[in-house]
Design a protein with these regions (language model features):
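Short helix/turn-capping signatures at newly exposed starts of structured segments
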Residues: 1-107, 111, 137-140, 145-149
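Short, surface-exposed coil-to-beta transition loops
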Residues: 63, 67, 115, 125-130
């Protein structure tokens, strides 16, 4: 079952970047703030991998199939967050340029298979974001990763 969030993709990315920058940010806190349950799916000596259990329906008809949070075990290191498997309403270049402005030139994948990502970067307000586009569907945004600077 999909979880309905009142966020737009843009406000979600900005909120996640804000959370990343706060001391003590972790997957439990992210899930609590968003009101979603995150499940530990994998762990190694350095990182815990969390994901949402069901797709997130965002404002504007956008669906985030996966919220991937990588929580580092090293003290004081901010989690890495990826909003991926974007579906529903296609977010194309026109909207991206309206929301984000100038983007870096595309970086093609080293191995162009259908699931490979073409990446670009830009700024959403004060937040630096990486944008991923599927090789098989380069006109629609497939993922967004907020970064703290």
């Amino acid at each position: 079952m999909e979880k309905l969030l009142m966020h737009t993709l843009w406000s979600l990315a900005q909120a996640l970047a804000e959370l990343q920058g706060q001391p003590g940010a972790d997957a439990l806190r992210v899930g609590g703030v968003l009101g979603i349950e995150l499940k530990l799916v994998k762990e190694n000596a350095h990182v815990r991998f969390y994901e949402n259990e069901s797709p997130l329906r965002l404002a504007g008809g956008v669906i985030a199939g996966k919220l991937d949070i990588r929580e580092f075990k090293a003290a004081g290191k901010a989690p890495f967050i990826i909003i991926s498997q974007l579906g529903g309403t296609c977010i194309g270049m026109e909207e991206l340029q309206r929301r984000i402005g100038a983007l870096t030139p595309p970086t093609p994948p080293s191995n162009p298979v259908p699931d490979a990502l073409i990446t670009r970067q830009g700024r959403l307000g004060k937040v630096r974001v990486s944008l991923g586009f599927r090789w098989s569907d380069p006109d629609c945004l497939a993922s967004i990763t907020p970064h703290i600077d």
